[in-house]
Amino acid sequence: MPVADTSQPMSGQPVSAVAERYASSLFELAREAGSVDAVAGDLNRFQAMIDESVDLQRLVTSPAFTSEQQASAIAALCDKAEIGGLVGNFLKLVAANRRLFAVPGMIAAFRMIAARHRGELAADVTSAHALTPAQETELKEALKSATGKTVTMFVTVDPSLLGGLIVKIGSRQIDTSLRTKLSTLKLALKEVG
């Protein structure tokens, strides 16, 4: 289960129609090649690289870079990280098409499609602190009993939550973060005062 330690995770991006189409195409190619798990692993590693690097986040989101600059940088990153084959070519194509901004959504969509194909649900979990293996197991079991399906979790760490976690499964979100509770309390106090 991939874990990225970051104060500004990009993996929580909403999934757009563009991201869904790209992810669906990548999934079909991976399924035909029998490499869905390998592709998922490479995508998870690339997402962790995005989450951990402000420079890579800028490359992915900034329109200031040309498609040639983005494609060249992505090719170098893929070579260095040994992300080749299907995912390497996919990322280079996405860069050439000036769609790098949608990569986090594409990765999230791929995870959902792959989980659905396996009869599972994909859950994006953002925690204020790294979860222990026991906490991960307990959360996975709680989500399984709530949904009735096996759950694959993708965990990121966001210290700005202060405490608690945010769990996203499809269009549903459960936010038990201390940051949200404090914001709610602040609004309630403004209404009273």
Swiss-Prot record:
A GO molecular function held by the record: proton-transporting ATP synthase activity, rotational mechanism
UniProt keyword list: ATP synthesis, Cell inner membrane, Cell membrane, CF(1), Hydrogen ion transport, Ion transport, Membrane, Transport
Cross-referenced InterPro entries: ATP_synth_OSCP/delta_N_sf, ATPase_OSCP/d_CS, ATPase_OSCP/dsu
Record-level GO cellular component terms: plasma membrane; proton-transporting ATP synthase complex
Chief place where the protein resides: membrane
Localisation per UniProt entry: Cell inner membrane
Cell membrane found in the keyword field: yes
Record-linked NCBIfam families: ATP_synt_delta, PRK05758.2-2, PRK05758.3-2
Family (UniProt): Belongs to the ATPase delta chain family.
Subunit relationships: F-type ATPases have 2 components, F(1) - the catalytic core - and F(0) - the membrane proton channel. F(1) has five subunits: alpha(3), beta(3), gamma(1), delta(1), epsilon(1). F(0) has three main subunits: a(1), b(2) and c(10-14). The alpha and beta chains form an alternating ring which encloses part of the gamma chain. F(1) is attached to F(0) by a central stalk formed by the gamma and epsilon chains, while a peripheral stalk is formed by the delta and b chains.
Protein name: ATP synthase subunit delta
Native species: Allorhizobium ampelinum (strain ATCC BAA-846 / DSM 112012 / S4)
